[in-house]
Structure formats: C-alpha cells, structure tokens
Amino acid sequence: MISCSEEGSNKILVAISLDRDESQNVLSWAINVLAKPSDTVVALHLLVGEEPRKLPMKKKKRTQIRHAKAHVISMLGEFAYTCCHNQVNLEAKVGFSSNIGRGLIDEVKSISAHYLVLSRPTTHEFRIWNDIKRYVSDFAPSSCSVVLVGNQRKPHKDCYSDSAISLDINSEKYSPRSVLNTLSRDSLSSSGDDASSFNGSMVSSSFASPSDKPKHKSISPYKFISSLIMNSPLRKWRGSETKNKPKPQPLIQCFTYNEISKATNDFHQGNIVGIGGYSEVYRGDLWDGRRIAVKRLAKESGDMNKEKEFLTELGIISHVSHPNTALLLGCCVEKGLYLVFRFSENGTLYSALHENENGSLDWPVRYKIAVGVARGLHYLHKRCNHRIIHRDIKSSNVLLGPDYEPQITDFGLAKWLPNKWTHHAVIPVEGTFGYLAPESLMQGTIDEKTDIYAFGILLLEIITGRRPVNPTQKHILLWAKPAMETGNTSELVDPKLQDKYDDQQMNKLVLTASHCVQQSPILRPTMTQVLELLTNGNEAEIAKSWRMPKDMTNDDDDNNEWDDYSMIFGYDVPSDSSF
C-alpha cells in the first residue's frame, strides 16, 4: 500500500486487466481526475476461477498468482509519486472469482467502495465486457457509482441504470461535427460538471437511456457551426438585451471561402504574419475596410488532434467576450477550417519585447499590458459561464491592440474545467517550454494555478525583457530568483528602460511574480488575489499574510527543485518551443 495521508474520505475500486496500456489509462484517470486528497484508490485484478483453498497450491496456480501480483504491484509503482503528491492512498489486490461481475460487486461491498471504475477493453471480447457491465450496473449498491472509461461503442439496450455513470471516450476521428457537437453540449450545460477530456479524447457523461437521447439530423458543418455560435451562452446573454428587436444579427459571422480568399489575396505568402505548430495566420482586408487576421489550419497537417485543437478554439472563443481577450469576428468551414479575428496592428507582446528594432516598450505600456493580461485571465477563470484554463499563456499569445491594450489569444489548448473539479489530467503534456508549471510538466495535471504560474513567468519577461528560455542563458526564473529573494528589484529591470520606470509599479509586478511562480500550486495566489497584488502591492491582504515563501529561499542549488527544467531538458533548447 502506498499511503500519503489519513484514512480516505472516498474509496475508489479500479478494475485492471493484464493489458498494461489499458490499465495505466484507467488508473491515471482515477488517480488524477476522480480522486481527491485523502481518497483511497484500490487497484483490483481478478483471476477467473475458484479461490484455491488447499495448501500447497499447484505450481501452475502459484505462478499465475505470482505473475498477477507482480503485474499489479508494478502498475502501482508507476503512480507512487503522483499519489503522494496528490495525497491519495493507493492499494493493490488480486482475487479469484468464477464470475468477474460478481467478484467486483463482492469487493465493492467488502471495502464499502464509493466508486467502481471499469475500463472498456480494446482487445477483449465485447460480449463478455457487456455482461460484466450489465451485472455491475444491476447489482451495484446505491452508495456506489459505476464509472466506465474507454472507447465508445454502440450502447447495449440494457446497459443503463440509475446507479451507473457512463464515461465514454469517443474514439472516432474528429470532424467539425463530432468535436463541435461535444462543445455545443458542454456549452449549454450550466456548470460543465459532467464533461471534460482525458488522454486527448472527448469524454461525456450519460444518465439517460438510449431512447431518451436526442437524435441529430445530418446538417452541413456550415449550418452546424452557425447554430453553435448562435446558441452560445454569450450570444443568449447579448441577445436578451435586444429581444424586442425583430431579428438580431449574429455577432460572429460565417464567412464564405471567396470572401476570405479575396481579403488575403488568395492567401498570398506575402500576407503571412504568423506560423504556428498547426496553423498559418494571414493579414487581409475585407470589402468593408475592416482589416482581419485569418487563421488557417495548415494544409499539410494530417494530425486529427490538431484539427480538434482548431475546432476547440472555435468552440471556446465563441463563448468569450472581454476587452482583454481576442475578438473573434467569424469562421469559415469551406475548403478547410478558418478563424477570422480582428487584426492587431501592434503585433504580439513577444515581437514588441524581443524583435522590435525601432525601440522597446516603455514602462507605462508594459505595466498596462501586465494588468490587462491579469484582467483577461481573471475573466477566464472567474467570470465565464465555464471555468476556462488557457494552458498556453505566453508573450506570443498576447496581441497588442491599437492603444497597446493586451488581448489573450490562441485557445487551441484551452480546457473547460467543471466547477466541482479541483484539477484535471492531460496526457500527453502540452504547452510551451519555459512557461509550463512544474506539476503540469511532471504529472500532467492542470488547473487555474497552471495559468497563474505561466502568468508569473510572463511578468518576469515584461520586467526583464529576457526570453523565458535562451540557449545561452539560464531559464528566466533561475536567473531572477536571487534578486527576488534579496529584494534587489533594480537588478531585474530591463536595461532598455534606462531606469525610466515607476518604482512602486515595478515593485508590485516583482511581488506578484514572486508569488505566481511558486513551485507548489497551493502557494500561488488566485487571479482575484493577483489583481489585488497588482493594485495594492504590499498593502494587499494576501501580501500582509504572506512573506517570501520558503521554497524561494532554498540556497542548495544542487537539490533545488526549481532546477527541474534544466535536469530534464537542459538549457540548450529553442526560445519558444511547444510540445
């Protein structure tokens, strides 16, 4: 047993098979997503047959048990660190049963489990799986919820019951309809508590029988995306203000391919203003004089996950409206996938800090950008109908408007986090090196504190004018740490400012950054507290109650976990590399 806390408040029984990948996935989901601190996860592997009662056992039976125990123990060993970090207890069990379903229910009753987690098999016979699922759904105690995780198949007509929660990972290829259909369902729920994603797949929750499920007519992606946009909570809220008008116009336009092609001069290479991992951004001019930026999914991108990210960005950003988030004008689904934004003449924060040959940003503009990004993140975390975790806050994802008002952009990695969830697990790790929080890099867990860590790095970038990672220099955090510990703010200031800055504002930014970049997520402030720090500095309540956190004052650089980045990747990496 791996124990890191007191007796668990919930017991989670996880049935694991001899399929290692399948078992790793279901255990990872149970530990990182379902379990909360003090919960106990019990990994159970059942051998088919009667439990041997005669001693000594036959050699074949002993070997079978030994192999099963070794398999289960080795599986648990891989999650030891994660369980200790999450304060989750982990136990292993091997049992016998002539009927797998009955064996699972017996164990549920034996340990008084609150959850029974099953993984849909990828290689086993689905008839047996359906029999097991039907049995546990029928006989699970009312105090135990049955959670099914795995590849979605056509549901059996008897597979649904009031005591079962079905979490189906959709394995079909992503398309505008399949991804946006999920996004549309999520957007119309009030809390989002029943939907998320695991291992890069779509996860849904179902409590109804198949007959109760709505039937979707076949519609074109163009019409479907239009309905998604018009049905978003943002559109409903704005529409309520004009409900007396005969026919409100959509706030997001569905462009035709001819319109955006003409605007960008047939996507001429001279109009490219940015190239990302899966997309290209073109400058264009519409017939009515509006200057736009058209984000196009790269033609050579055959990765369905990239298409999913593109569509996820559409689904999320169509629900976002704030002065400090990018304004989506519309989209196009003809001859590819396109997002249309208002063009930002001043480019990105990254280009302004690191590539502007005509001069650097002066201090009032930098301070304005820092506060604006904080307000945008506060909106995403606290003010949206859903909690939105951006997951890729960095200087190249901050656009600068006409008056250098910052706007957070690129929601391709963003997640809607259900209100009742404390964190979320994402496999594989995604984001931009240099901004990734330690818990995200090491364990794949994300929440609001992941964004707050990245925001702290962004503040240091604004203050110092240094890139987070440079092939010839230390990571910006390792470089800045001594000055933050001693309070020598002047050592951090970008030389390009030539000492032309407001001391009080600078101290507020350094103070805020020092709290945001703590290794432990618990020590980091919320975005509400971040705004208070930026406004009131040392007079903020959180500043009065906090001093320089202990994990900022470790002088043993050889053992300091701040150096996790250098231990894993070294410093000789691209300055803006994305996973």
Curated annotation (Swiss-Prot):
Record EC number: 2.7.11.1
Modification Phosphoserine occurs at: S396
Residue numbers bearing the Phosphothreonine modification: T256, T432
InterPro entries: Kinase-like_dom_sf, Prot_kinase_dom, Protein_kinase_ATP_BS, RBK1/2/STUNTED, Rossmann-like_a/b/a_fold, Ser/Thr_kinase_AS
Ligand binding (ATP): V273, G274, I275, G276, G277, Y278, S279, E280, V281, K295
UniProt KW keywords: ATP-binding, Kinase, Nucleotide-binding, Phosphoprotein, Serine/threonine-protein kinase, Transferase
Active site: residue positions: D392 (proton acceptor)
Keyword Disulfide bond listed: no
Pfam families per record: Pkinase
Major enzyme class: transferase
Sample GO molecular function, one term: protein serine/threonine kinase activity
Reactions performed catalytically: L-seryl-[protein] + ATP = O-phospho-L-seryl-[protein] + ADP + H(+); L-threonyl-[protein] + ATP = O-phospho-L-threonyl-[protein] + ADP + H(+)
UniProt record similarity statement: Belongs to the protein kinase superfamily. Ser/Thr protein kinase family.
Protein name: Probable receptor-like serine/threonine-protein kinase At5g57670
Biological source species: Arabidopsis thaliana (Mouse-ear cress)
Phylogenetic classification of the source organism: Eukaryota, Viridiplantae, Streptophyta, Embryophyta, Tracheophyta
